[in-house]
């Protein structure tokens, strides 16, 4: 796509590798097993968002260790979860909304 030049991709072996290489002051874990909605989180600039695999989610020991930082996207009782890309989009846009959409155009213009 034509916007890859705006993306910085970093690859980590696992969660331990990530934490060894980054200083994490604020984080949120998005999981179907979380106690509260993502809309209850107060997202700040520089926070990290963690999402697990579509098939398994984040490891339960990781969720237990960071339970106060776990949030969920409300779902119908008969549906398991959103797919990963949709869950990321929903959560990231809520975080950006709370930060007043920094560096994003927040207006539109009709063609004349």
Specify the residue positions occupied by each region the protein language model found.
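Post-transcriptional modification and biogenesis factors for structured RNAs
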Residues: 1-112
């Amino acid at each position: 796509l034509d916007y890859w030049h705006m993306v910085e991709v970093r690859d980590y072996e696992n969660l331990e590798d990530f934490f060894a290489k980054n200083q994490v002051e604020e984080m949120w874990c998005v999981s179907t097993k979380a106690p509260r909605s993502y809309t209850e989180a107060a997202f700040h600039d520089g926070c990290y968002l963690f999402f697990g695999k579509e098939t398994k989610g984040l490891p339960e020991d990781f969720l237990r260790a960071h339970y106060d930082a776990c949030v969920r996207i409300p779902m119908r009782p008969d549906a398991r979860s959103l797919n990963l890309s949709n869950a990321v989009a929903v959560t990231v846009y809520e975080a950006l909304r709370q930060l007043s959409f920094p560096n994003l155009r927040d207006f539109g213009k009709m063609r004349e």
